[in-house]
């Protein structure tokens, strides 16, 4: 939660969401996919500001503003409009989004921005983030928005509505996006599940992993995470093969403990045993691939 230099303005971060694991249980009769995921949030973020204004507007700035395209259907505005429908008399305003996270990247940038908008409107209007109306609007805005509202490490199940907090240690990491957008719908289409299909067996559903408790080490978490993959990685590789090149670069880096894709791609991440290893690996990969978006930091 941040203040802004603009008089009367409020500011929030839209932190990148990273799926440490992602299991597709199956596809429901309504076409949505049931998922199980361990989610963490990175220390890189978009910045969203809300300033007093009689009209609801959105202006984009920052190095990746052009990637946002037409803002009329941006999730920030969608979330604000839906909350205004749900909460009579809601005070809105002028949003300014400083866009630094890649779009269509598997790190929930648009969802994080929408969640930041909901937090800003909640602050402006004295709403609790636990308000059922806000929670319903978050899910209606997008499947990843509910988890981005608190932006805390958790397990996420269902279509994104069931969240359970996790005591995740701070994980040194490198995140890479090859600056190639990947549409989520294309990856699920490549996965090829029809409504009613299951990707996992009943025994797999019953044998849900027990995640480490508070105080567990990075090594304990890496060992647990290594038991569950990202089911969208194989179909995403078919849609955009450069993901394989990114994963190879991460897996070849010194000190890497675990590397995989986040969400539906194309962003991939690696976990390291210490901050120094992550920074050295990130710098080396950025030097070898200046065309890629590379961030060395932490997940928590």
UniProtKB/Swiss-Prot annotation:
Mind listing the UniProt keywords for this protein, alphabetically?
Answer: ATP-binding, Isoprene biosynthesis, Kinase, Nucleotide-binding, Transferase
This protein's pathway reads:
Isoprenoid biosynthesis; isopentenyl diphosphate biosynthesis via DXP pathway; isopentenyl diphosphate from 1-deoxy-D-xylulose 5-phosphate: step 3/6
User: Would the keyword Transferase turn up in this protein's UniProt record?
Assistant: yes
Biological process according to GO: isopentenyl diphosphate biosynthetic process, methylerythritol 4-phosphate pathway; terpenoid biosynthetic process
The question of whether Zinc-finger is a record keyword is answered with no
Top-level EC class as recorded in UniProt: transferase
Catalyses: 4-CDP-2-C-methyl-D-erythritol + ATP = 4-CDP-2-C-methyl-D-erythritol 2-phosphate + ADP + H(+)
**Might you give the EC number(s) for this enzyme?**
2.7.1.148
Q: Which domain of life is it from?
A: Bacteria
SUPFAM superfamilies cross-referenced by the UniProt entry: GHMP Kinase, C-terminal domain, Ribosomal protein S5 domain 2-like
Q: Where does ATP bind?
A: 102-112
Q: Where is the active site?
A: 17, 144
Q: GO molecular-function annotation terms?
A: 4-(cytidine 5'-diphospho)-2-C-methyl-D-erythritol kinase activity; ATP binding
Which cysteine pairs are joined by S-S bonds?
none
Q: What does this protein do?
A: Catalyzes the phosphorylation of the position 2 hydroxy group of 4-diphosphocytidyl-2C-methyl-D-erythritol.
NCBIfam families associated with the record: ispE, PRK14608.1
Q: Which family does it belong to?
A: Belongs to the GHMP kinase family. IspE subfamily.
Name the UniProt record assigns to this protein: 4-diphosphocytidyl-2-C-methyl-D-erythritol kinase
State the taxonomy lineage.
Answer: Bacteria, Pseudomonadati, Pseudomonadota, Alphaproteobacteria, Hyphomicrobiales
Q: Which gene encodes it?
A: ispE
């Amino acid at each position: 939660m941040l203040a802004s230099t603009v008089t009367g303005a409020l500011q929030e971060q839209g932190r990148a969401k990273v799926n440490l694991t992602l299991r597709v249980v199956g596809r429901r009769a309504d076409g949505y996919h049931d998922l199980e995921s361990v989610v963490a949030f990175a220390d890189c973020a978009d910045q969203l500001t809300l300033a007093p204004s009689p009209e609801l507007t959105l202006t984009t700035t920052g190095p990746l503003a052009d990637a946002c395209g037409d803002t009329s259907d941006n999730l920030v505005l969608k979330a604000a409009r839906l909350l205004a429908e749900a909460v009579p008399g809601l005070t809105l305003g002028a949003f300014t989004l400083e866009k630094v996270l890649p779009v269509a990247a598997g790190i929930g940038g648009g969802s994080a921005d929408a969640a930041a908008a909901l937090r800003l409107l909640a602050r402006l209007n004295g709403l609790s983030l636990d308000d059922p109306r806000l929670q319903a609007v978050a899910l209606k805005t997008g499947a990843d928005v509910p988890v981005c509202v608190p932006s805390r490490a958790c397990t996420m199940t269902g279509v994104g509505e069931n969240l359970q907090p996790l005591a995740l240690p701070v994980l040194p990491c490198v995140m890479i996006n090859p600056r190639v957008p990947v549409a989520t719908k294309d990856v699920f289409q490549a996965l090829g599940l029809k409504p009613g299909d299951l990707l996992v067996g009943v025994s797999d559903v019953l044998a849900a992993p027990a995640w480490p408790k508070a105080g567990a080490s990075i090594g304990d978490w890496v060992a647990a995470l290594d038991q569950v993959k990202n089911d969208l990685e194989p179909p995403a590789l078919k849609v955009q093969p450069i993901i394989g090149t990114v994963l190879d670069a991460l897996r070849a880096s010194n000190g890497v403990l675990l590397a995989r894709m986040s969400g539906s791609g194309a962003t991939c991440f690696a976990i390291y045993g210490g901050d120094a290893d992550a920074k050295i690996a990130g710098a080396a990969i950025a030097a070898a691939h200046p065309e890629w978006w590379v961030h060395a930091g932490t997940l928590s």
